[in-house]
Amino acid sequence: MTAILPSTAATVNTGFLHFDCVGKTFPTPRGPYVAIEDVNLSVQQGEFICVIGHSGCGKSTLLNLVSGFSQPTSGGVYLDGQPIQEPGPDRMVVFQNYSLLPWKSARDNIALAVKAARPHLSTSEQRQVVDHHLELVGLTEAQHKRPDQLSGGMKQRVAIARALSIRPEVLILDEPFGALDAITKEELQEELLNIWEEARPTVLMITHDIDEALFLADRVVMMTNGPAATIGEVLEIPFDRPREREAVVEDPRYAQLRTEALDFLYRRFAHDDD
Ligand SMILES: Nc1ncnc2c1ncn2[C@@H]1O[C@H](COP(=O)(O)OP(=O)(O)OP(=O)(O)O)[C@@H](O)[C@H]1O
């Protein structure tokens, strides 16, 4: 006997965040431009994914589909089985350029987000959330400064604290440390891992830095070049957590994974512009 099942046409149950044959084509004056094509990936809840690939390969295009700022032209992107159709507080984006409100203090930038996204919390609970997140990123002392009174690293700390204070299910990071000096960058990578361990959002992060990806991610997704870019290879990163940078870098598997990534990017999918 054949059982009659409810229709599942609108839902997909593979992975928490699921890319199913995703394509995105942009109309241009010279005709349609196929940016990405046939992207398939299943991300588990709480997983940390880094996406690397050459400039213009479609990394931001992919992230915009997850944030809901744009829609795929073929296939679908699903969160918890539901197609992503618009932006929402369950998915927060942190950009390279901080995007803080310039006239508000660090504290108020975070407080406003908490107020808007978690209105069910009492005023004192909201205050506690803000205090906690300022502390997590080491900005308790500097909380009353405005963005123009903060360093680049401090601004990015505020942006990360603001995103996480909303308790998003998915944290989307678009090259968040790209503009920072090497030391600040390493500090923030470590802070990000500490915060991620606490809240465990699913993370999707674009980076151009192979070492950053190997230190942070559970899996590194490497994209081929466009047009019609797709996922070329996925590296599983085996290092135990919590991670210590020295232990990771000294692990013999680190050099091997690094060589694989370099080989992918600079030999198999070399790009003239890089
Ligand atoms: N709105 C648009 N209209 C036309 N083409 C677009 C549009 N947005 C992106 N593209 C093209 O799609 C391709 C992918 O762009 P995308 O910004 O996703 O790349 P990226 O990998 O994030 O690049 P980068 O590392 O330089 O930020 C590029 O060739 C880009 O020119």
From Swiss-Prot:
Question: How would you describe this protein's topology in the membrane?
Answer: Peripheral membrane protein
Q: Which reaction does it catalyse?
A: nitrate(out) + ATP + H2O = nitrate(in) + ADP + phosphate + H(+)
Q: Which UniProt keywords apply?
A: ATP-binding, Cell inner membrane, Cell membrane, Ion transport, Membrane, Nitrate assimilation, Nucleotide-binding, Translocase, Transport
Give the CDD domains listed for this entry.
ABC_NrtD_SsuB_transporters
The entry lists its GO molecular-function terms as:
ABC-type nitrate transporter activity; ATP binding; ATP hydrolysis activity
Q: A GO CC term? A: plasma membrane
Q: Which GO biological process entries does UniProt record here?
A: nitrate assimilation
The UniProt record lists the ABC transporter domain at 17-250
Annotated compartments: Cell inner membrane
Gene3D superfamilies hit by this protein? P-loop containing nucleotide triphosphate hydrolases
Effect of loss of the gene: Mutant requires high concentration of nitrate for growth. It grows normally with nitrite or ammonium as the nitrogen source.
Q: Where does ATP bind?
A: G53, H54, S55, G56, C57, G58, K59, S60
Position of the signal peptide: none
Q: What class of enzyme is it?
A: translocase
- The EC number(s) this enzyme carries: 7.3.2.4
Instruction: Give the stretches traversing the membrane.
Output: none
Q: Which NCBIfam families match?
A: ntrCD (TIGR01184)
Q: Which family is annotated?
A: Belongs to the ABC transporter superfamily. Nitrate/nitrite/cyanate uptake transporter (NitT) (TC 3.A.1.16) family.
Oligomeric form and interacting partners? The complex is composed of two ATP-binding proteins (NrtC and NrtD), two transmembrane proteins (NrtB) and a solute-binding protein (NrtA).
Q: What does this protein do?
A: Part of the ABC transporter complex NrtABCD involved in nitrate uptake. The complex is probably also involved in nitrite transport. Probably responsible for energy coupling to the transport system.
Q: What is this protein called?
A: Nitrate import ATP-binding protein NrtD
Organism per entry: Synechococcus elongatus (strain ATCC 33912 / PCC 7942 / FACHB-805) (Anacystis nidulans R2)
